[in-house]
UniProtKB/Swiss-Prot annotation:
Lipidation (N-palmitoyl cysteine): 22
Signal sequence segment: 1-21
Protein name: SPbeta prophage-derived uncharacterized lipoprotein YonS
Disordered as annotated region, ranges: 27-57
GO cellular component: plasma membrane
Keywords recorded for this protein, A-Z: Cell membrane, Lipoprotein, Membrane, Palmitate, Signal
PROSITE patterns from the UniProt entry: PROKAR_LIPOPROTEIN
Residue spans of biased composition, Low complexity class: 27-46
Topology in membrane: Lipid-anchor
Subcellular location: Cell membrane
Regions crossing the membrane: none
């Protein structure tokens, strides 16, 4: 997630500046510094980082440029079919990156079950939340690059990421609604129905 990585770098630079400014004070109180360092180390060690990815609310896991804390989650897979496309929402995570940036990560998988060339664009999925916020497109910078065109029996998977302005937007999140346009062929003929999925989350 590029934006999260930039945020992590910014936090690192800020920390280095603060350390440089406090250098003289730290040298004159080495015993106090040792105590503080020990405290910081213990605090860091006491924060469990989920190495296998998040599984429940409250989990902290690694992302590019730092960590994210889960505010709401769905581990239940939802699979639907529209025309020749089989579409699965594998996981939904609402989290806050580096205690600053709220986002929703929708992990998906799409499969063309036909030999036709099919155009299907989950990368343009519209999202609405139970908290009353609507985002018309995922963040192109943060989301994985997904196929728009499926040449025969191929599949694709990845994350589509929605970035929010305020943590309140995902606090106590009960569900999301995901809308995706119908698949179509090279002649622009619709091959199925639009998808309109509701995913319930634990929070």
């Amino acid at each position: 997630m590029k934006l999260f990585k930039k945020l992590g770098i910014l936090l690192l630079i800020t920390s280095l500046i603060l350390l440089a400014a406090c250098k003289n004070s730290e040298e004159s109180s080495s015993s106090s510094e040792d105590t503080n360092n020990a405290t910081d180390t213990n605090t860091s060690e006491s924060q469990d980082i989920s190495v296998n990815g998040p599984e429940k609310v409250g989990d902290v896991y690694e992302i590019d440029g730092g960590t994210a804390k889960v505010m709401a989650i769905s581990n239940k897979e939802t699979t639907v079919k529209t025309g020749p496309i089989q579409f699965t929402v594998k996981k939904v995570i609402a989290a806050v990156a580096n205690e600053q940036l709220p986002f929703i990560d929708v992990q998906i998988e799409s499969e063309n079950t036909s030999d036709e060339v099919v155009r299907f664009r989950p990368s343009l999925a519209q999202l609405a939340t139970s908290t009353g916020v609507q985002i018309d497109e995922p963040s192109l910078l943060e989301s994985d690059r997904l196929l728009d065109e499926y040449v025969g029996k191929v599949n694709d998977s990845g994350s589509i990421i929605y970035v929010f302005d305020n943590e309140e937007d995902i606090k106590d999140l009960e569900s999301i609604r995901l809308r995706i346009s119908s698949p179509f062929n090279e002649d622009l003929k619709n091959l199925g129905d639009k998808l309109d999925l509701k995913i319930n989350l634990e929070h």
